[in-house]
């Protein structure tokens, strides 16, 4: 009986830790996912990067749609300034056909995406990182051969109106890192649609 209780507690702790995902200071796992051009993309492809902006997003979510231009803007600003942006679509396409790979290709072309748009078809990356919403940002900084999480959360403080944004969390974090300072706001609440997890 005691062994069973211990096993149940250990399992609960393990599941809780897994569900929690990454927090600032954690080392982020590398991944290799398929891009809309058919090529595989991983963090280690960016050998000269200072860090990477990983954004979990999708096609159908109204919040993601509102942020598409801002995500593209981040990529244009930072792709060649040391912090390239990678977008990852983790949604179950059975529940939302609009997030299918072919639809991702169309969306990227229509919107002129200047960043890789990857499909996390097993949802393993989203689960490992602890992504729960679309969009959900994980800002990574390269330290040696590893990538360390420096910021987790929202892109900025105004989902509805880009012109009314007061704090650009991702840009602020990158500016602080570039200045050799710690990130003053390292965690915010991601506002968006819940990720559509595959049903068992």
Language model feature labels by segment:
Residues 49-52, 80-85, 111-116, 134:
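Loop/turn elements at helix/coil->beta-strand transitions in domains of secreted/extracellular proteins
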Residues 65-110, 121-127:
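Structural microenvironment flanking redox-active thiols in thiol-disulfide oxidoreductases
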Residues 139-200:
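Thiol-/selenol-based redox modules, centered on thioredoxin-like
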Residues 18-44:
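N-terminal "domain-start" segment that seeds a small globular fold
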Residues 58-67, 137, 193-196:
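Short, thiol/selenol-centered motifs that function as redox-active sites or metal-ligating centers
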């Amino acid at each position: 009986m005691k062994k069973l209780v211990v096993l149940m507690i250990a399992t609960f702790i393990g599941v809780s830790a897994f569900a929690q995902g990454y927090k600032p200071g954690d080392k982020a796992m590398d991944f290799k996912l398929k891009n809309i051009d058919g090529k595989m993309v991983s963090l280690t492809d960016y050998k000269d990067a200072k860090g990477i902006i990983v954004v979990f997003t999708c096609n159908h979510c109204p919040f993601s749609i509102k942020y598409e231009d801002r995500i593209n803007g981040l990529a244009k600003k930072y792709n060649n300034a040391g912090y390239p942006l990678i977008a990852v679509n983790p949604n179950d396409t059975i529940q939302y056909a609009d997030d299918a790979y072919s639809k991702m290709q169309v969306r990227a072309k229509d919107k002129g995406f200047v960043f890789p748009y990857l499909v996390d078809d097993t949802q393993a990356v989203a689960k490992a990182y602890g992504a729960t919403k679309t969009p959900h940002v994980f800002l990574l900084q390269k330290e040696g051969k590893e990538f360390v999480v420096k910021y987790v959360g929202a892109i900025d403080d105004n989902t509805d109106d880009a012109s009314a944004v007061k704090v650009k969390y991702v840009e602020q974090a990158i500016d602080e890192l570039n200045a050799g300072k710690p990130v003053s706001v390292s965690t915010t609440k991601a506002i968006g649609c819940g990720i559509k997890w595959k049903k068992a």
